[in-house]
Amino acid sequence: MTSVGPEGVSSCPHPLGAALRAHYIYRKEAVVLTKLEVLGLRSLVPTLPLNEEGDAGNDPIQILGINGLGPVKANITTAPFGAFDGEALSGMSVPKRNIVLTIGLHPDWAVQTIEELRQLLYNYFMPKLLVQLRFHSTNFPVVTIEGYVESMEPNIFVKSPTIEISIICPSPDFVAMSPAVITGISNDGSDTTDFEYIGSVQTGFYLKVEKAVETSGEGSIQILLSGEYAPQSFSARGTLDDNVRFEMNTVPGQKYVRSVDNTLGTITNYLNDISYDAIWPTLYPGVNRLAIITTVAGQNWELSYYPRFGGL
């Protein structure tokens, strides 16, 4: 089993010429957020690092607070029974996330002004702009979330000016920047590959199976996944050949089952060959036990996924 960890992200200089930094350390039960990076997704806007290095009192941009990092309140819908007390669950979902940044401005008066810092932040946080936030912490990998700026409200005519920025994130989860990768060999289901999923909410994955020993070509490929939850079983047909690999994706909104020619890039779709009782497998927090079953055992497989977190 191999795992690919998150890579460090280098900081870019800002248009005023010096590194633009700000402190923010959030402590809760030994979990420490050490750095926030803001990426403007418009062209020509560099990364804006807001970090813990150096003296917070000397940083021109300082994060005074961040709200909206905890788990988002779920929408639980129920319907009343007609003949007896109580209600029946009819659905549940987690809506958008609203992150609110409170930022203080403390320019180096020899080279900067309050207005210059405020105009710099406008490049990132003008309402309707899409931004990406990257959070660094002591207990999590580097995670990212994207959202749209709802509002940016500067408090201009005060002695210590601040700016409050509201960001709406349609997808509420924080997602690891780098994937975890696990490899193994297919078998008859008698052996499993056990690994721990560190995320706090379930996630889909990408699976690739390639020929390693002689096989008949098209055949059955089955995924068995279990752990601290109900077992999941998924069975479909796929082709394994010297130049053809099997792929599937179980991420909601991106699902597919197919075989791909490594040379020509042609794709054979197998969505219509999924078993009627198949459950699209997802990883749950905790230990997951995975078995990949092929018509002829001994084929190479690789599974990759991005851990997801419902709160920091």
Model-assigned labels for residue ranges:
Residues 2-5:
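Extreme N-terminal basic, low-complexity initiation segments
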Residues 10-77:
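Polar/acidic, low-complexity leader/linker segments enriched in S/T/G and N/D
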Residues 71-91:
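SsDNA-processing nucleotidyl-transfer enzymes
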Residues 84-109, 159-173, 288:
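Oligomerization/assembly interface segments of phage tail-like spikes and tubes
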Residues 93-97, 125-127, 157-161, 199-201, ...:
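Solvent-exposed loop and beta-edge segments used for protein-protein assembly and interaction
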Residues 93-100, 105-128, 132:
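Compositionally biased, low-complexity regions
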Residues 127-173:
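Short beta-strand and beta-hairpin "edge-sheet" elements
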Residues 175-312:
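Intrinsically disordered, low-complexity segments enriched in serine, threonine, and glycine
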